């Protein structure tokens, strides 16, 4: 077999592990710091040894020129070509991949405190992706690569992902606050927005949509409201609507970026997708803020602004 060094690079959760499996099946020796430990220079030394027997594939993130240099140097030393496979998975797709992987492996969306104790390189806090984006340097032939190939990301859902849902923001979408704060801190402060019940019932009963809720509740982290009060407000909102909407909420605030559950991050969406095997292209997110729209985009949901959505008289044919 022809000797070569293949560096597979891209965001965490970009799909590198899936791609490297094809190379291993072909007889390539995989070198990965998450498996062997050590530094990139240690991997380079291992590559130096392994190349005596055949081709090598490496699949860590390799975000900058410095992180790739020692591996390329091994190729030059042995006059062996070094090929770069650059996974063009976007930041947003990598975020969703990370959340889906997390839910599939642990059954839940990990919280900031979980990342302090977990020992799995495939389960990482959101700051890892932001750091990669910050330090990333585009690979070039000038570095010493003999070839650079772009690998597009194509998301494919399994045949079990067939269900659809209406995902709803709460504050500003279903209700307003009559209290001193922008968001209700007690059920008595909830004022329902008009024309909500009828359309939601039509989507649920006539068109067969699940009704799910996704909300940011940073007041919990700020200390202006308790988690118990927030949940009482959700339950009272559902009671006023006459519906049992399953809701998930984020209690954290930014900065810092510490969780995947705060919209526009796709964590809550990933949780719903996995739990109910949703087909995102058949789902609709309804909200009133840019964060809601970005959340929908990252999850692959359709999006409608609350004012536009609740102006509908019935479920449109395209969504039946």
Question: Could you tell me what each predicted segment is?
Answer:
Residues 3-9, 89-164, 257-259, 263-271, ...:
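Conserved GTP-binding G-domain of TRAFAC-class P-loop NTPases and closely related GTPase folds
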Residues 6, 11-69:
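Conserved substrate/cofactor phosphate-moiety recognition/catalytic segment
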Residues 63-107:
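ATP-dependent NMP and nucleoside kinases share a basic, alpha-helical "lid"
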Residues 157-166, 235-245, 258-285, 289-320:
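Asp-based, Mg2+/Mn2+-dependent phosphohydrolase catalytic module
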Residues 161-179, 215:
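Asp-based phosphoryl-transfer active-site loop
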């Amino acid at each position: 077999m022809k000797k070569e060094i293949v560096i597979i690079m891209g965001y965490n959760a970009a799909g590198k592990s899936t791609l490297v499996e094809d190379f291993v099946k072909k007889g390539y020796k995989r070198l990965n710091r998450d498996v062997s430990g050590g530094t990139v220079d240690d991997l380079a030394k291992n590559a130096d040894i392994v190349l005596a027997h055949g081709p090598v594939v490496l699949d860590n993130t390799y975000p900058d020129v410095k992180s790739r240099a020692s591996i390329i140097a091994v190729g030059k030393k042995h006059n062996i070509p070094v090929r770069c496979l650059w996974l063009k998975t976007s930041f947003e797709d990598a975020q969703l991949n990370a959340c889906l992987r997390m839910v599939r492996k642990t059954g839940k969306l990990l919280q900031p405190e979980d990342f302090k104790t977990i020992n799995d390189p495939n389960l990482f806090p959101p700051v890892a992706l932001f750091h990669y984006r910050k330090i990333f340097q585009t690979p070039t032939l000038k570095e010493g690569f003999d070839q650079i190939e772009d690998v597009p990301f194509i998301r494919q859902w399994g045949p079990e992902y067939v269900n659809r849902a209406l995902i709803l923001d709460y504050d500003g979408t279903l209700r307003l606050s009559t209290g001193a704060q922008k968001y209700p801190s007690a059920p008595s402060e909830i004022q329902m927005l008009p024309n909500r019940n009828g359309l939601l019932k039509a989507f649920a009963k006539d068109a067969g949509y699940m009704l799910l809720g996704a909300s940011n509740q940073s007041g919990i982290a700020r200390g202006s409201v308790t988690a118990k009060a927030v949940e009482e407000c959700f339950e009272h909102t559902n009671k006023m609507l006459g519906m049992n909407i399953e809701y998930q909420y984020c209690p954290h605030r930014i900065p810092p970026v510490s969780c995947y559950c705060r919209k526009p991050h796709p964590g809550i969406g990933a949780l719903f997708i996995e739990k109910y095997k949703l087909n995102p292209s058949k789902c609709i997110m309804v909200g009133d803020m840019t964060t809601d729209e970005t959340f929908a985009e990252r999850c692959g949901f359709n999006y409608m602004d609350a004012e536009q959505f609740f102006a509908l008289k019935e479920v449109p044919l395209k969504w039946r």
